[in-house]
């Protein structure tokens, strides 16, 4: 790198310049050197050692004063060092950004005042330099001098420049000092940004092919019908009056016979390809595919490329500094705008944190209740249903009373300590012990009776307690859950049994949607002889889904259930080592080894089958499914690269703190991350070390979730408990929590028409246009800051990546 390029990089260093500021009598912070200039103009003696650059005439000093009032410290220093004097003269000559003289100056001429007024009337010119180029890379940024600082500088308040509700106090990018750097960047910087753009393009390709983008999902189209219909609103926003309505629970309204079941699709068929993935083709034409899904080889080539980029030293340093900059920018924003945010929030009628919509974006269904609730339920069944036959064990049917007598327990003996389902210190870094906590009193038979959908009583008890939890959710009105429910891939009829459990027991609510979790347990099934190869699991998981997509009448209950399913999750202990025994991974039908396939292999076969399925479902007008696996909780950070390519969002993601380049990519693409600090605290990472607050400050798309209330929560409202602990430990403001609640709704899989009611009719638009503060209680100023910061980062990527394309074209 030559000396000029090095100097340009040093000029744009993110290191803060030394501060030489003091408070004046009004409490405002001003620059000492600029104050001296103002004193000199007023006739006050100035130190003879004042640098020549600061001995400016009245026009120059005023221009510098006005800018310094709105610039951050290091940008102010940078501006002075790179020719403020010449800049002010240029702007004066071109009449592009002339400000009024301070009232205390005795050398102010009437021509200068007229020029200043002309400058105020052309606000667009005021935001440009003498070359006509914008001062900030983001066209949407509104950097207007705050009224208090205008008064201090002596400039009158002009109505045309009154700050809007979405503008915020912030330093501007001094492009006069960096324009040459932007126009002639170093080759290293071009290469780094080109790699970022390449990775983003790869993700866009995989997401588009698999129809995982929100705007591709038919359920987000205007004509989609939700059945049972969502509750009628009890408030008319037009007349601002309360409307008396009576909304019945969905379980009472739902009638399976009223559900529309379409007929067979004669145009398309499905079969297995060479990679043992299901593909969809024209009937009778196996070579005419509905979509070209990336092969296993293509996927691993792309994965290796991304891993190589993310582990490159300069790329890691670059991403780390960008993330540090984002965090520092947040700290400055929060320092200057905290009270304005609070003021807007207080003026918003009716809304506060408790009555904005929030979604528990990651919670396992079998652990959706707390211990006290489960204990009361077990005691109730022992009192009222003790003679009911509940399990077939040891060659005979046992009643509930006989089961507890075999355990030498009565209802009176039961307590929270007896259940022993809470994750205490002994589960830290012991996922095997944590899994045992799903067994009440350590007995698998009680888990089978009370916490399974597929048992002798057909999951009746689990349906009953789930309805009680749902009743609490519906009463709270503003809390919603996305429950993970298991399909193991051990047999072809699992999907039909699960769908029958949901439909027959009417476990249906407008507060609940489902994700199907796939445990990575091939090695156990292989050892017990349930499956012969990995292909058996893939077949059991996906063949019923392709069958019901081709002909919904072949599995009518499954078709109705899938309308309430958002997508797939992949679960298990990530800390297990992925040993690579093959130079080239075999396809599933040839994977007969006893070892479990690696995480990346599991994820690809979930992705490839879901991609073909989604293409077909979208063509038929059915809702599509997304991939939202557990990822980055423990184990190899490379799991996060696989998920970045293939998944719509992830759960946990705490290992992103170790891979800054991948974390930067997650920020740029706003990949949804459902974080559970209380869960991490019990298993893998103590609460104080959790990266959640840093992710939030930097602008990653994070939400809070409970994971397993049965193991981690003590109250009847585990989601509120999660928020409250985070607010206390991380000192989150009310606006912060409302922003997290809004994030959770955006990440969730509810239909667009429901999200419009929850967070605003234009929620899918970018920036302030997509925010409805009346519904979200998030001030426009916060949304504008988030959008402006992200836009600037994306524009930087596009700006510098274009240089490489231009060079290659030449």
From Swiss-Prot:
Zn(2+) binds at residues 362, 364, 630, 707. InterPro entries: A/AMP_deam_AS (IPR006650), AMPD (IPR006329), Metal_Hydrolase (IPR032466). Substrate binds at residues 364, 433-438, 633, 708-711. Homotetramer. It catalyses: AMP + H2O + H(+) = IMP + NH4(+). Belongs to the metallo-dependent hydrolases superfamily. Adenosine and AMP deaminases family. Pfam families: AMP_deaminase (PF19326). GO terms for cellular component: cytoplasm; cytosol. Its cofactor is Zn(2+). This is AMP deaminase.
């Amino acid at each position: 790198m030559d000396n000029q390029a090095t100097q340009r990089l040093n000029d744009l260093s993110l290191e803060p310049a030394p501060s030489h500021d003091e408070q004046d009598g009004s409490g405002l912070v001003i620059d000492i050197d600029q104050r001296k200039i103002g004193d000199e103009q007023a006739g006050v003696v100035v130190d003879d050692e004042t640098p020549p650059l600061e001995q400016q005439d009245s026009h120059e000093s005023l221009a510098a004063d006005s800018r310094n009032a709105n610039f951050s410290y290091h940008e102010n220093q940078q501006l002075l060092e790179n020719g403020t004097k010449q800049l002010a003269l240029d702007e004066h000559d071109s009449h592009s950004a002339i400000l009024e003289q301070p009232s205390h100056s005795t050398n102010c001429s009437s021509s200068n005042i007229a020029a200043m007024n002309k400058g105020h009337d052309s606000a667009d010119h005021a935001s440009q330099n003498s070359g006509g180029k914008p001062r900030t890379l983001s066209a949407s940024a509104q950097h207007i001098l705050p009224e208090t600082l205008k008064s201090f500088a002596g400039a009158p308040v002009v109505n045309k420049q009154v700050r809007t509700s979405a503008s915020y106090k912030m330093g501007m990018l001094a492009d006069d000092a960096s324009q040459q750097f932007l126009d002639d960047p170093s080759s290293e910087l071009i290469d780094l940004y080109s790699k970022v753009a390449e990775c983003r393009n790869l993700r866009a390709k995989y997401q588009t092919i698999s129809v995982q983008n929100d705007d591709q999902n038919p359920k987000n189209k205007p004509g989609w019908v939700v059945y049972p219909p969502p509750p009628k609103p009890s408030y008319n926003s037009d007349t601002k009056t309360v409307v008396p309505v009576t909304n019945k629970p969905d379980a009472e309204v739902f009638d399976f016979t009223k559900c529309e079941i379409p007929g067979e699709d004669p145009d398309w068929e499905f079969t297995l390809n060479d990679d043992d993935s299901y593909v969809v083709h024209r009937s009778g034409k196996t070579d005419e595919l509905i979509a070209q899904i990336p092969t296993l080889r293509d996927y691993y080539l792309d994965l290796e490329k991304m891993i190589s980029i993310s582990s490159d030293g300069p790329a890691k340093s670059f991403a780390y500094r960008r993330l540090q900059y984002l965090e520092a920018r947040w700290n400055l924003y929060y320092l200057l705008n905290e009270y304005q945010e609070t003021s807007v929030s207080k003026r918003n009628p009716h809304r506060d944190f408790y009555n904005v919509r929030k979604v528990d974006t990651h919670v396992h269904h079998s652990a959706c209740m707390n211990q006290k609730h489960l204990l009361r339920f077990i005691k109730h069944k022992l009192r009222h249903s003790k003679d009911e036959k509940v399990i077939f064990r040891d060659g005979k049917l046992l009643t509930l009373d006989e089961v507890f007598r075999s355990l030498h327990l009565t209802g009176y003996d039961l307590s929270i300590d007896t259940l022993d389902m809470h994750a205490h210190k002994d589960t830290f870094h012991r996922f095997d012990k944590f899994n045992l906590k799903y067994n009440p009193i350590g007995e698998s038979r009680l888990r089978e009776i009370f916490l399974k959908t597929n048992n002798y009583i057909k999951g009746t008890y689990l349906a009953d307690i789930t309805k009680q939890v749902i009743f609490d959710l519906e009463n709270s009105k503003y809390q919603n859950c996305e429950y993970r429910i298991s399909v193991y891939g051990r047999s072809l009829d699992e999907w039909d049994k699960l769908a029958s459990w949901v439909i027959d027991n009417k476990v249906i609510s407008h507060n609940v949607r489902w994700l199907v979790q796939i445990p990575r347990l091939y090695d156990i099934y292989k050892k017990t002889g349930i499956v012969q190869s990995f292909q058996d699991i893939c077949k059991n998981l996906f063949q019923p889904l392709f069958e019901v997509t081709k002909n919904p009448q072949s599995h009518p209950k499954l078709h109705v259930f899938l309308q309430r399913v958002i997508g797939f999750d992949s679960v298990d202990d990530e800390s297990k080592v992925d040993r690579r025994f093959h130079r080239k991974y075999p396809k599933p039908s040839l994977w007969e080894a006893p070892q479990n396939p690696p995480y990346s292999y599991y994820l690809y076969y979930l992705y490839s089958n879901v991609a073909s399925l989604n293409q077909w479902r979208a063509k038929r007008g059915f809702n599509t499914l997304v991939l939202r696996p557990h990822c980055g909780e423990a184990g190899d950070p490379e799991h996060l690269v696989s998920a970045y390519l293939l998944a719509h969002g992830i759960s946990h993601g705490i290992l992103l703190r170790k891979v800054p380049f991948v974390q930067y990519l997650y920020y740029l693409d706003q990949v949804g991350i459902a974080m559970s600090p209380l869960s991490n605290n019990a298993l893998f990472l103590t609460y104080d070390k959790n990266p959640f607050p840093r992710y939030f400050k930097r602008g990653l798309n994070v939400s809070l979730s409970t994971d397993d209330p049965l193991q981690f929560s003590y109250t009847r409202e585990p989601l509120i408990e999660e928020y409250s602990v985070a607010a206390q430990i991380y000192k989150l403001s009310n606006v912060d929590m409302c922003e997290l609640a809004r994030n959770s709704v955006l990440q969730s899989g509810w239909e667009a028409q429901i999200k419009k009611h929850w967070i605003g009719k234009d929620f899918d638009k970018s920036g302030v246009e997509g925010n409805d503060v009346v519904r979200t209680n998030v001030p426009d100023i916060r949304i504008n800051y988030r959008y402006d910061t992200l836009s600037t980062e994306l524009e930087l990527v596009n700006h510098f990546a274009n240089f490489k394309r231009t060079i290659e074209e030449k």
